Regions:
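Subtilisin-like serine protease catalytic core
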Residues: 1-87, 105-111, 122-124, 150-153, ...
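Extracellular S/T/G-rich loop segment that most often corresponds to the catalytic His/Ser-adjacent loop
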Residues: 2-19, 23, 174-275, 279
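Substrate-binding/access-modulating region of protease and related hydrolase catalytic domains
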Residues: 34, 76-193, 222-225, 246-272
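Hydrolase catalytic cores
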Residues: 43-45, 75-79, 169, 232-313
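Structured segments of extracytoplasmic/periplasmic soluble domains
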Residues: 45-52, 88-98, 116, 140-144, ...
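Secreted peptidase-domain scaffold signal
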Residues: 161, 322-433
């Protein structure tokens, strides 16, 4: 969002104005076109119908590529390049821009917002990631009643980022406290394929899969809250691509397909896999007429995730498992829902002070602030503690049916391994030493 007004000479519109798809005077018309292919790949990861047949491995064995939730509807929102992320989020979440003010229209246009993009470079933000303007807005969009008394909240899922493997490498929007951040694990589908032939980086046999990828960004968030939340495939797999794709596009090093599919990956793939899983979950909840909010979706996905036996700041709750999440909703045995009563309040307390400096009037938001209600969250954030202070919480475990389940609780201790000091001078807004 620009800090000054600019008026287009041709159409007479101020920058940041939402325009109709077609100008009645014939000066312009809008075209939704994914010229790079990234949006097509992320959408196909979620919604591919799996009807096209491909010879992926050049062995005459035909394959289809099915999305996670093939019956969903995709609402494309142009937000980067010729667009604005903030405007796109607000509109998809059910707000309309009227005379430079955002007015809630009564319900979100999308059940889930999926973000396969991110900014991990501090200087380009001019704010600490997690306390930046976009993170404040994302947090408010997730929480019911934050922007309007009737606002129901929107589930927002984002890539954790590809800046790993160090801790504290997440950027916005994945680092926002109340959104769902998704990191990347390996797949064995691409082993020996095309440009990956002979590469040992992710394992050269099909025995290797579901390992956390080196580039997957790690937590924690800037206030110390646990991130990421979930993991899914990000290195790598196949997706349908645009029908305008030329032979060899998006592939190098030999073995490039002549058909309209591509190798895709990164946490840009992980996020839509989780978003598709959330869509299946929403479908199940609606079929059973069960009430839910973004925190219920988050807790169901995290409670049903498969533990990959990494620390929480690397893997979150673990590998997303849509089937087990739906099984909890349907009351099947073997899985349970877990959440605590302190995380939401502790996060809110930590971000309330920087949030108070945010001038929402500049963005046309009259009712800005985080709801005073509390919401259960699976992961635990103990708050900001001074030396010698303690914190506690109460975890609630919900069995989805009447059959007994066995639960094992294993305490773990985190300890300092080594203390290092780095000397250097940081140039503000430019680079770190």
């Amino acid at each position: 969002i620009s800090d000054k007004a600019e008026i287009d000479d041709k159409i007479g519109a101020v920058n940041g104005t939402l325009l109709p798809a077609m100008d009645k005077n014939g000066n312009y018309f809008g075209v939704m076109n994914d010229f790079f292919g990234h949006g097509t790949a992320t959408s196909a990861t979620i919604a591919s119908k799996g009807k096209m047949v491909y010879d992926i491995y050049n062995d005459t064995k035909k394959s289809t590529i099915l999305g996670i939730a093939p019956d969903v509807s995709i609402l494309p929102v142009k937000s980067l390049w010729f667009g604005d992320v903030f405007y796109g989020w607000m509109w998809a979440a059910g707000f309309e821009n009227e005379e430079s003010k955002w007015v809630y229209a009564g319900e979100p246009k999308a059940d889930i917002i999926s973000n396969s993009w991110g900014v991990s470079n501090f200087p380009s933000l001019e704010y600490v990631p997690g306390l930046d303007i976009s993170s404040h807005i994302l947090n408010a969009l997730v929480i019911p009643q934050s922007l309007h008394q009737n606002y129901t909240g929107t589930t927002i899922i984002s890539s954790s980022g590809n800046s790993g493997h160090g801790y504290g490498t997440m950027g916005m929007p994945g680092i926002s406290s109340f959104g769902i951040a998704v990191g990347a694990v390996t797949s064995n589908d691409f082993v020996g394929y095309g440009p990956f032939k002979g590469q040992p980086r992710f394992g050269n046999t099909t025995d290797h899969s579901d390992h956390v990828v080196d580039f997957s960004s790690r937590g924690p968030g800037v206030i110390g809250d646990p991130k990421p939340d979930l993991m899914s495939i990000g290195a790598y797999s196949f997706v349908p691509s645009a029908i305008t794709k030329l032979p060899g596009d998006g592939c190098s090093g030999g073995g490039c397909p002549n058909e309209s599919f591509s190798v895709f990956g990164g946490t840009s793939m992980s996020a839509p896999i989780a978003a598709g899983s959330a869509a299946l979950l929403v479908e199940s909840l609606k079929e059973k007429s069960m009430s839910y909010d973004p925190f219920a979706i988050r807790n169901l996905l995290m409670s049903s995730a498969e533990d990959l036996h990494n620390d929480p700041l690397t893997q979150g709750a673990g590998l997303v498992n849509a089937l087990d999440a739906v099984r909890i909703v349907n009351g099947h045995g073997g899985k349970f829902l877990v959440h605590n009563d302190a995380t939401f309040s502790n996060i809110k307390e930590a971000i309330d002070v920087p949030l108070s400096t945010f001038n929402s009037d500049l963005f046309g938001i009259d009712e800005f602030g985080l709801s005073d209600k509390t919401f259960p969250i699976t992961s635990w954030y103990g708050g900001r503690l001074n030396p010698g202070e303690e914190t506690t919480t109460t975890f609630t475990i919900e069995n989805p049916n009447n059959y007994p389940i066995d639960i094992t609780i294993k305490p773990e201790t985190l300890k300092l391994i080594e203390n290092l000091q780095i000397s250097g001078i940081t140039e503000p807004h430019l680079q770190d030493p």
